[in-house]
Every structure is written in C-alpha cells, then in structure tokens.
C-alpha cells in the first residue's frame, strides 16, 4: 500500500539521539539499525579511505534484500542476521581471507587494507609466492653440499647416488662400495670413485660385467694398423712390410716409405759390363767360328776391388781344351789344359785396386803372352796350338765371369768363380766388340756403375746367407759372437745382421732405425721381438763410415765401441740372453742385409738394409762371394760413391 511504501523513507530518532551526535558513530546503530548515508558512514569510520571502501559495498548489501522484508526486520535486533552479517563483514579486510591459505600465518585488518603475515618459506603481499631457498644467493644451494630440492614453503637437501646424508641433513658422504662388497669386481680391481666405483683392468683388457673378469681387447679387429696388426694379451703391435720399402711411422700405427738419407751415385753405362750380375753362372756367353789360322786373343780394360774370381773362360767345341783367365790374390792367374799340356801360372802386379787396368792375353806360336798396361807380366810356353782347328775352322766358346758347371771339377786349382768387377773396351779374337755392346745395352742389370768405392753394397732388396759355427769348445761360455761392423747406410732403417733359427724365429738381430731426432739414426740390438740395447741418435748417414763392435755370450752383451746406450734391466737382459742361449744350442743361419721369409712380428725391424757394410764375425772378414746364397743385386766388393751435388743439380 502507499502507506507501507512510504515507510522506507521514514527515520525515527531514538531516545537521547542528541547525545549520540557527539560520539563516534557506531556501525550497528548508524547503518544497520538505521539507514545511513555516506556522511553518516564517515562518522563511523572517521576517515575517507575506509568510508570510500565501505559505502559502495553497503549499498550492495541493502539492495540484496527486498524492501518489505527490511521494514519488518528492523523491529528486532535478532531479526536481521543476513543484513547484519553482510554489513558487519564489509569493514573487515581479512574477510573473506585475502591471504594464500598455504602461505599465511595471520591476517591483520587495516584501514581499507590488510596485512598478511607469511609463514617461513613464503613471500608476497598475500603470501602467495614460495621462496626458493635453493637459489638464495646469500645461502648458496640452500647450504646443501649436493642436491637442493625446493618444496612449497620449504626445501630439503638430498644426495646423489653413491652418497649418504650426514646427520646435519646438509652434507653428503661418499659410499665406499669396494669396502662394502670386496668381491663385486671379481678378478678385476675395484676402485672407489666419488659416488660410484669402477672395476679396473690392466691396459689392453676390458671388464666383462657378466663374467666379472678382465678380457683381452682385440685391437686388431678395430683396424688400428695401416698394414699388419698382431694382437697379444694386453696389447697389440703394428708392423709394416719392410721388404716392400715401408717402415712404421712415429704414431706406431701408420706406415711410411723408408726414405733415403744419403743419396748414392747409381749411374751406369752400357759400355761397362758388370761381371757379378749372376751369383751363380756366367754373365755372357759368346761363340766364335774363325779360320783355322786364327789364334786365341783377348784384350780388355778391367776394374775391381775383388781379390779372386773368374774373368773369362774359353774352351773348344768338344771341351777337350780350355783356358781360364782369373784373379787370385789380386793377381792375374792363367790355367790351361789341352792335349799337349796342363799348366797354371799366377803373376804380375796386384790389380784389384779399383783402377782401370788394360789386360791382354794373346796366343803366340809357342807361348801365351799376358800383358798389363801393355807390359808383359807372364809368358807361358805351350808345345802346340791352344785349340785345335777342325774342318778348316777354329770354333771357340767364351764365357765371361764364370764357367760351365761341369768344368769346376776339371780345374787344376779350384777357384771361386764369382768376381765383382767391370770390363770395358773388350776385343775378343781380334773381332772387336763383335756386337756385344748391343747385347748389353738391352739389359740394364748387365751395366756397371760408373764410379765405385771399396766395400760391400746392399741395395735394400735382398740378403746374403752364411752358415757360421759360433761354438767354441775351448771357451767356457760355449758359444760367442764377436761382431765388427763398418757401415755407411743410404737409408735410415734396415736389418744389418740377423741370426735365424730353424723354426723361423730371430734370436739375435742388429738393425738400423730412424731416430726421433732429426737426421740421426739409432742402432738396436734385439732378441726376437725385444730390444735389449739401443744406441741413440747417431749421424750415420754421412760420407764417413761408422764403426760398431760388440761381443755376446750366454751371460752378457758388451759394446766395445764407446757410444751412449739405452738398455733394459739386468734381470730382463738375462731373460733375453737365456732365449738366445737356447737358440744358439741349435742350428742358426746368419743373414746380412735383411731377413728371410719370417713373420713380420719376428723382429722390431724387417726392412732390408741399404748401403755399404763390411762385416767381421769372430775374427773372420765375411766375403760375400763365399755366401751360401746372395741376392744378385748385392755387390760383394764394390760400393756406389756418394752422390755429389753439382751447381746444376
């Protein structure tokens, strides 16, 4: 009704209302029991911020109730719980709770504001932000020695695997697994490391988790070496084919060519016939058919350092008569035999001086004349023709640097047919060169070096074999090896001397290897694959020859040349000498200039020696002409000169 509607605007004053004007306003009295305007609300709060905050919310509370209900409700204090609670809650900033429930400890109401007091580990106006103690710069890593784990409002320290937390809850201590479980690695060695343990094996072995044992690593299956790889328990060794001119590089894995350290003058001329082209057999064979009035004659220039060997051998077609021109003791020797006589004569000056000497042999009517430099040195009487003509022809066969094998038993005095020398300007049977130059020109191996020196030359492509008895019954040591080497190498790597047993092991070897020092070489003495002596950093590739002397028996190896050496321990040396002693009681062959076909791994070095070398063993100078076998390119008594640079070279 109109009457009821108008009562919303009615405001009745209470008793003593005049006295109330002098007191601070009361929220219950001013705005709940009665309606209040903003000014009246300010009387309650006595400040603008709280008033400005309260009054809009107060109007919301009023509008949330119907006016009819409100009029009835204000007759009793107990009848307005909803409005009262709504209005009473407006000034309390902590209701509803503005703080983060997890992070706050208390909420303090203020004038249109509130203050949240945070629990430890929280921050922010409403305590809504967790403090990350693990990133506190003033307390690095939260004071944890290893792991700091941040949690809402707190944090805790933890340890990595293999560590345990100490009582201070911050520091970690390593767990020694090897002490806790001594057998956990089986046959391997247990090594404790921070936070863990390792099962260690010697170098070259790998740990097997399943068997708990150390197993050999086959490095060769991993293609570690450029050429040959030999695996052995705990390691491996790379080898290069020295016989093909390779050596092991400094990295001990790759191969590189054996380089020349001293160039030699290997120039040859086809006009010079090399007499030592073949180790066994003749170098050149000629056959002459001349009128019966012809007599044997030979004229040539001859150069050698060799003291013995066959220059030429001539015989009749039916082998009934023969003539041998040779060198023995450096002098010309003539042996002849026919139906009339059998003779041997040696005479004249020594001509194995490395100079060119003109030699002529001429059959005269009653003698054979031998001349050197056109001066007669021998005149051998003969009762008749040296070779008998048949059917009006004189047929003669001439052999250079040797004779047919069957002749050897018919000689008046045996002679080693091998002769290291050269012939030029030959004239046989007064027929001049007779096409011989054309034959020689086509074959490079028959050409002689232009310049040579005295010595023996190893070309880096072959070996010489000797059978030497090293046993000495009068010596208490049983056997001994006394060696003297005079060397002038052309390459810095190669086997100079080796003893090889019947089972293809190499119980003793003396080799040359390039040193780690620039332009120098080492000499290594080895027993099988173990280096027992190393003579370091020698300048061997020079014009001057180097001298090395040593002696070995079952108890000791003694270097007689005053050089700096590096050796293994005395105990290990005796072990290696015992290996040598066992081999020396059996059969061994002596090789110069390299090795026969033995495994690469038999010695530390397997390349051929290249250069000049003279060898004396147990007081005997080894003559390569007396070797059991010798590579054809090895020169027994001549060595190429060192290449001398010219201004134009």
UniProtKB/Swiss-Prot annotation:
SMART domains: EGF, EGF_CA, GLA, LamG
Every Gla domain range: 15-60
InterPro entries per the UniProt record, alphabetical: Coagulation_fac-like_Gla_dom (IPR017857), ConA-like_dom_sf (IPR013320), EGF-like_Ca-bd_dom (IPR001881), EGF-like_CS (IPR013032), EGF-like_dom (IPR000742), EGF-type_Asp/Asn_hydroxyl_site (IPR000152), EGF_Ca-bd_CS (IPR018097), GAS-SHBG-PROS (IPR051145)
Region of interest: Thrombin-sensitive: 61-89
Top-level lineage group: Eukaryota
CDD domains attached to this UniProt entry: EGF_CA, LamG
UniProt domain EGF-like: residue ranges: 90-128, 130-173, 174-215, 216-256
GO cellular component, one term: Golgi lumen
Disulfide bonds: 31-36, 94-107, 99-116, 118-127, 134-148, 144-157, 159-172, 178-190, 185-199, 201-214, 220-229, 225-238, 240-255, 422-448, 612-639
Any GO molecular function: calcium ion binding
Listed GO biological process terms: blood coagulation; fibrinolysis
Residue span(s) of the pro-peptide: 1-14
Keywords on record: Blood coagulation, Calcium, Cleavage on pair of basic residues, Disulfide bond, EGF-like domain, Fibrinolysis, Gamma-carboxyglutamic acid, Glycoprotein, Hemostasis, Hydroxylation, Repeat, Secreted, Zymogen
Record PTM (3R)-3-hydroxyaspartate, positions in chain: 109
Sites carrying sugar chains: 472, 482, 503
PTM field: The iron and 2-oxoglutarate dependent 3-hydroxylation of aspartate and asparagine is (R) stereospecific within EGF domains.
Subcellular localization, as worded in the UniProt entry: Secreted
Pfam families, per database record: EGF_CA, FXa_inhibition, Gla, hEGF, Laminin_G_1, Laminin_G_2
PTM-bearing positions, type 4-carboxyglutamate: 20-21, 28, 30, 33-34, 39-40, 43, 46, 50
UniProt cross-references to PROSITE patterns, sorted A to Z: ASX_HYDROXYL, EGF_1, EGF_2, EGF_3, EGF_CA, GLA_1, GLA_2, LAM_G_DOMAIN
Domain Laminin G-like positions: 272-448, 457-639
Tissue-specific expression: Plasma.
Biological role: Anticoagulant plasma protein; it is a cofactor to activated protein C in the degradation of coagulation factors Va and VIIIa. It helps to prevent coagulation and stimulating fibrinolysis.
Record-given protein name: Vitamin K-dependent protein S
Chain's gene name: PROS1
């Amino acid at each position: 009704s109109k009457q009821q509607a108008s009562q919303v605007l009615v405001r009745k004053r209470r008793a003593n209302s005049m006295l109330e004007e002098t007191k601070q306003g009361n929220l219950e009295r001013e705005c709940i029991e009665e309606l209040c305007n903003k000014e009246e609300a300010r009387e309650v709060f006595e400040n603008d911020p709280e008033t400005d905050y309260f009054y809009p919310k107060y109007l919301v509370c009023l509008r949330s109730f119907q006016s009819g209900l409100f009029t009835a409700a204000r007759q009793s204090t107990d009848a307005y719980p909803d409005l009262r609670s709504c209005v009473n809650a407006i000034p309390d900033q902590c209701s509803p709770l503005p703080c983060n429930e997890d992070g706050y400890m208390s909420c303090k109401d203020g004038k249109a504001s509130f203050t949240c007091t945070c629990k430890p580990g929280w921050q922010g106006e409403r305590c809504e932000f967790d403090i990350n103690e693990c990133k506190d710069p003033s307390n690095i890593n939260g004071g944890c020695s290893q792991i700091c784990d941040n949690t809402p409002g707190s944090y805790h320290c933890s340890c990595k695997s293999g560590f345990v937390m100490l009582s201070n809850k911050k520091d970690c201590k390593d767990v020694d697994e090897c002490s806790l479980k001594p057998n956990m690695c089986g046959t391997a060695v247990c090594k404790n490391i921070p936070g863990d343990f390792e099962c260690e094996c010697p170098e070259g072995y790998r740990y097997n988790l399943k068997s708990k044992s150390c197993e050999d690593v086959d490095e060769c299956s991993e293609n570690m070496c450029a050429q040959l790889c030999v695996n052995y328990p705990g390691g491996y060794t790379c080898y290069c084919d020295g016989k093909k001119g390779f050596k092991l590089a400094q990295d001990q894995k790759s191969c590189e060519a054996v380089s020349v350290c001293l160039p030699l003058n290997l120039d040859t001329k086809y006009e010079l016939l090399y007499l030592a082209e073949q180790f066994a057999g003749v170098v050149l064979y000629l056959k002459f058919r001349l009128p019966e009035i012809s007599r044997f004659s030979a004229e040539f220039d001859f150069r050698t350092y060799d003291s013995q060997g066959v220059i030429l051998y001539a015989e009749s077609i039916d082998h009934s008569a023969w003539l041998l021109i040779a060198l023995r003791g450096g002098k010309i020797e003539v042996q002849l035999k026919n139906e009339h006589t059998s003779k041997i004569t040696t005479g004249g000056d020594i001509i194995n001086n490395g100079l060119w000497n003109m030699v002529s042999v001429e059959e005269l009517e009653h003698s054979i004349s031998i001349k050197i430099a056109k001066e007669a040195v021998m005149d051998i009487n003969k009762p008749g023709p040296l070779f008998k003509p048949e059917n009006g022809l004189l047929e003669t066969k001439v052999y250079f640097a040797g004779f047919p094998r069957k002749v050897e038993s018919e000689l008046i005095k045996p002679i080693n047919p091998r002769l290291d020398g050269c012939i030029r300007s030959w004239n046989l049977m007064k027929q001049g060169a007779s096409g011989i130059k054309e034959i020689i020109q086509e074959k490079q191996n028959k050409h002689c070096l232009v310049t040579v020196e005295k010595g023996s030359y190893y070309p880096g492509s072959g070996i010489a074999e000797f059978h030497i008895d090293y046993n000495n019954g009068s010596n208490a040591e049983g056997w001994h090896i006394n060696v003297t080497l005079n060397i002038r190498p052309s390459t810095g790597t190669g086997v100079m001397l080796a003893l090889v047993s019947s089972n293809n092991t190499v119980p003793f070897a003396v080799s040359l290897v390039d040193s780690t020092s620039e332009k120098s070489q080492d000499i290594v003495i080895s027993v099988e694959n173990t280096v027992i002596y190393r003579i370091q950093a020698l300048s061997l590739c020079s014009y001057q020859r180097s001298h090395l002397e040593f002696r070995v028996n079952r108890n000791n190896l003694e270097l007689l040349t005053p050089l700096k050496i590096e050796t293994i321990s005395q105990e290990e040396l005796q072990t290696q000498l015992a290996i040598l002693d066992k081999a020396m009681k059996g059969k061994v062959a002596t090789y110069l200039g390299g090795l026969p076909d033995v495994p690469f791994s038999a010695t530390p070095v397997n390349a051929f020696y290249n250069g000049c070398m003279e060898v004396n063993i147990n007081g005997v100078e080894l003559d390569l002409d007396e070797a059991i076998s010798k590579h054809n390119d090895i020169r027994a008594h001549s060595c190429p000169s060192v290449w001398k640079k010219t201004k134009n070279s």
